[in-house]
Regions:
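Catalytic cores and adjacent flexible loops of soluble metabolic enzymes
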Residues: 1-297
Length: 297
């Protein structure tokens, strides 16, 4: 009997490294992505085309993409904030572009200075351009299990944003517990609400491990049919709302949990550990101000 397959979307090179207080050299980013690919991870978010003034850590995304090895059967994804970012991503050869919205009005206004409805309207031209260029479009929804400003977020609010993203043309919607406050019961309620308006096959889960419940939340949602999980190698990326606390759940932990549950991921644990060791070692040198040009590549 063939094991049920769960696809891990590796977000470390973008969502993880963009939160670093230092600029990570292009060589390190490329070396990390090469190792992730060798570990069997074929869905990799490699960067973003957001203004360098806002996210300087991602300013070299075009240079990173120009050096990436072929990814047959997989996709290199990038985050885009607007049509200008999309055009840059297309020119760089992105295999997928991602757009983002919030399930919390307060977070939307604090993060991108507009309402949820306005943010979705702004992405309509991006969705149209992606459709015309036959580039797959992914959607992110933040604060699905809690907001740093509003507190509790209702599942129905999450479902409506997810529905709108799919209506725009997103083939997949990733639901993010941005501040890592969710519980398994809350996660199940959220997935159930979204699955009522979006096919569960198009739902991904993006958990942060701020309070140590990410794996429990993922496990609860797997039982409801979720088959796509976002994670970051070595748990890259902290939580901006809880300094010093973990952010993204570690890919190593997710892969081990799925393997123990008898679920197939296609990930080689030893190669994944090598990728984690590579990036943590490189980051330690960068943070210390050391030259990484001779770092093992």
């Amino acid at each position: 009997m063939t094991a049920r397959r769960v696809r891990i979307v590796e977000v470390g090179p973008r969502d993880g490294l963009q939160n670093e207080p230092v600029t990570v050299p292009t060589d390190v980013k490329v070396g990390l992505i090469e190792r992730l690919l060798a570990a069997g991870l074929t869905s990799i978010e490699v960067g973003s085309f957001v203004s360098p003034a806002w996210v300087p850590q991602m300013a070299d995304t075009p240079a990173v993409m120009a050096r990436l090895p072929p990814n047959p059967g997989g996709r290199y994804s990038v985050l885009v904030p607007n049509l200008r970012g999309f055009e840059a991503a297309r020119a760089a050869g992105a295999g997928e572009v991602a757009i983002f919205a919030s399930a919390s009005e307060a977070f939307s206004r604090a993060n991108i200075n507009c309402s949820i409805a306005e943010s979705l309207d702004r992405f309509a031209p991006v969705a149209e351009a992606a459709r015309a260029a036959a580039i797959p479009l992914r959607g992110y929804v933040s604060c699905v299990l809690g907001c740093p400003y509003e507190g509790m977020v209702m599942p129905q609010a999450v479902a409506e944003v997810a529905r709108r993203l799919v209506a725009l043309g997103c083939h997949e919607v990733s639901l993010g517990d941005t501040i890592g406050v969710g519980t398994p019961d809350q996660a199940r309620a959220c997935i159930a609400a979204v699955a009522a308006v979006v096919p569960v096959e198009r739902i991904a889960l993006h958990c942060h491990d701020t309070q140590g419940r990410a794996l429990d939340n993922i496990r609860a949602c797997l039982d409801l049919g979720v088959g796509v999980v976002d994670a970051a190698v070595a748990g890259l990326g902290g939580c901006p709302y809880a300094p010093g606390a973990p952010g993204n759940v570690a890919t190593e932990a997710v892969a081990a949990m799925l393997d123990a549950a008898g679920l197939a991921t296609g990930v080689d644990p030893a190669r994944l550990a090598e990728a984690g060791a590579f990036v943590t070692g490189a980051l330690a040198r960068v943070r210390a101000g050391a030259d990484v040009s001779a770092f093992p590549g």
